[in-house]
Amino acid sequence: MQQPVNYPCPQIYWVDSSATSPWAPPGSVFSCPSSGPRGPGQRRPPPPPPPPSPLPPPSQPPPLPPLSPLKKKDNIELWLPVIFFMVLVALVGMGLGMYQLFHLQKELAELREFTNHSLRVSSFEKQIANPSTPSETKKPRSVAHLTGNPRSRSIPLEWEDTYGTALISGVKYKKGGLVINEAGLYFVYSKVYFRGQSCNSQPLSHKVYMRNFKYPGDLVLMEEKKLNYCTTGQIWAHSSYLGAVFNLTVADHLYVNISQLSLINFEESKTFFGLYKL
């Protein structure tokens, strides 16, 4: 069915959900309200859309009810034994720690006292086992170092035993020789420095010998002989050194002998004689 389109506004029909009444009952057609005169062919603008419905507020949990004073008191009474037990455990731990510390200090003091007593006993036992007399502890070591003496004019050589670097202890110096006062092992040494303005064919001899009433003659301990030690017509110098260990007895006399007395340089750093007990 064709309807005229020349109407001031579109007609609005009420539509029922019933299948038997597709159209609204008579009188249910809404007419456009008059809004003043309009010209022919003009249409009325559509009505504005309805405002959006406000969103419901977000759901929030209901507030908790306040605790009653009776429940608070019950909670406090429940925690008091726990707190008391924790404090009691801490105090017991501190007491045990202090007891252990005191016990360890006591054991350490006893150990120190025992160690000191053992050391004193050990030292006393050593003194009993190895008694030493004051003479033995204060006894000087046997040693001697004699230097060249320019006043020496005879054989065996004379030595300086007092001045300069000379020293003597535990032995005696007598007429150019060292006299042994205590038997034992000794290191004996001697050095002689020869020099000359011209060369000759005579050999240089340097020896250390010993005298004792047990032997009929001199006993040579060390000796050196040197040949071809210089060149004819030239100044020359030669150093002779002897040293060895010997088992000497009481009253042994040690001497030094050389071949040419006039060729010796008697400086204390170049010509000397000595020994020391091992």
Swiss-Prot record:
Highest taxon, organism lineage: Eukaryota
Pfam families assigned to the protein according to its UniProt record, in alphabetical order: TNF (PF00229)
Induction section of the entry: By PMA/ionomycin and concanavalin/interleukin-2.
PTM annotation, UniProt: The soluble form derives from the membrane form by proteolytic processing. The membrane-bound form undergoes two successive intramembrane proteolytic cleavages. The first one is processed by ADAM10 producing an N-terminal fragment, which lacks the receptor-binding extracellular domain. This ADAM10-processed FasL (FasL APL) remnant form is still membrane anchored and further processed by SPPL2A that liberates the FasL intracellular domain (FasL ICD). FasL shedding by ADAM10 is a prerequisite for subsequent intramembrane cleavage by SPPL2A in T-cells. Phosphorylated by FGR on tyrosine residues; this is required for ubiquitination and subsequent internalization.
Transmembrane segments: 78-99
Biased composition (Pro residues): 43-68
Domain THD: 142-278
Bilayer topology term: Single-pass type II membrane protein
Gene3D superfamilies membership: 2.60.120.40
Localization annotation: Cell membrane; Cytoplasmic vesicle lumen; Lysosome lumen
Residues annotated as site: Cleavage: 78-79, 126-127
Alphabetic keyword roster: Apoptosis, Cell membrane, Cytokine, Cytoplasmic vesicle, Disulfide bond, Glycoprotein, Lysosome, Membrane, Nucleus, Repressor, Secreted, Signal-anchor, Transcription, Transcription regulation, Transmembrane, Transmembrane helix, Ubl conjugation
Disulfide topology: 199-230
Annotated segments matching region Disordered: 26-68, 125-147
Extracellular face residues: 100-278
Tissue: Expressed in activated splenocytes and thymocytes. Moderate or weak expression found in small intestines, kidney and lung.
Keyword Nucleus belongs to the record: yes
Compositionally skewed regions (Polar residues) per UniProt: 125-135
Annotated glycosylation sites: 116, 247, 257
Topological region Cytoplasmic: 1-77
Family: Belongs to the tumor necrosis factor family.
Function as written in the Swiss-Prot or TrEMBL entry: Cytokine that binds to TNFRSF6/FAS, a receptor that transduces the apoptotic signal into cells. Involved in cytotoxic T-cell-mediated apoptosis, natural killer cell-mediated apoptosis and in T-cell development. Initiates fratricidal/suicidal activation-induced cell death (AICD) in antigen-activated T-cells contributing to the termination of immune responses. TNFRSF6/FAS-mediated apoptosis also has a role in the induction of peripheral tolerance. Binds to TNFRSF6B/DcR3, a decoy receptor that blocks apoptosis.
Protein name: Tumor necrosis factor ligand superfamily member 6
Organism listed in the record: Rattus norvegicus (Rat)
